[in-house]
Amino acid sequence: MRGRNRIAVSMCTQLRGGLWRGASGVTAIELVIVLAIIGILAGLSLPAYRDHVLRANRGEARAALLSLATAEEKFYLQCNEYTSALDAAAATACSPASLRFPTASERGYYTLAVTSADAIGWTATATAVSTLPQYSDTRCRTFQLTSAGAKTARNSGNSANDSECWNR
C-alpha cells in the first residue's frame, strides 16, 4: 500500500508544479495572431453586413410607396382626382384637403413625393436622403411607383435598376 501512495503523491506533485510551471500567461506572438485573425474576419464580414443593411432598408422605400398608393386611391374615391399634395400646406379645395401623408418614410431614410398627379394617374417617388447612410446605396437610390402599377428604380448614375431594387 505504501508504494501506491507514493506514486499517487508523486503524480499530484508533478501535475501541480512540474508540468504547468512554465505556462503562466499568453505570449505576445499569440496575442498578435489572435488580433490578426479577428482583423481578417472583421474585414471580410463588415462589408457584407453593411450591404445587407442597405438592402433591408430598401424595403422601407417600397412599403412607403405602396402605402402612398393606397392613400392616393382613397383620395381619388373622395375627390374624383389624384393629388400631389402630401401635407395640408399644399391643400386643394376637395375635402380632405390633402393626403395627410408624411413626406418621409417611417425611419426617415427616404423622402417621398408625388411628382405628377392629375385626373387619370399619379407618379410617386422615394429618394434616399443625402445626409443619411442609406444614400450610400448606389444601386437603388430612387424608387418610383405609378398609378398603373409600374415599378421603376434608379441607381446613383440614374440608370434603371428595377429588378434588383423591387424584387429583393
Indicate residue ranges for each PLM-predicted region.
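N-terminal leader/signal peptides at the extreme start of proteins
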Residues: 1-26
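Conserved hydrophobic beta-strand within the GNAT/NAT acetyltransferase core sheet
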Residues: 28-31, 72, 126
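N-terminal single-pass transmembrane signal-anchor helix
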Residues: 22-49
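Outer-envelope exported proteins of Gram-negative bacteria
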Residues: 64-67, 127
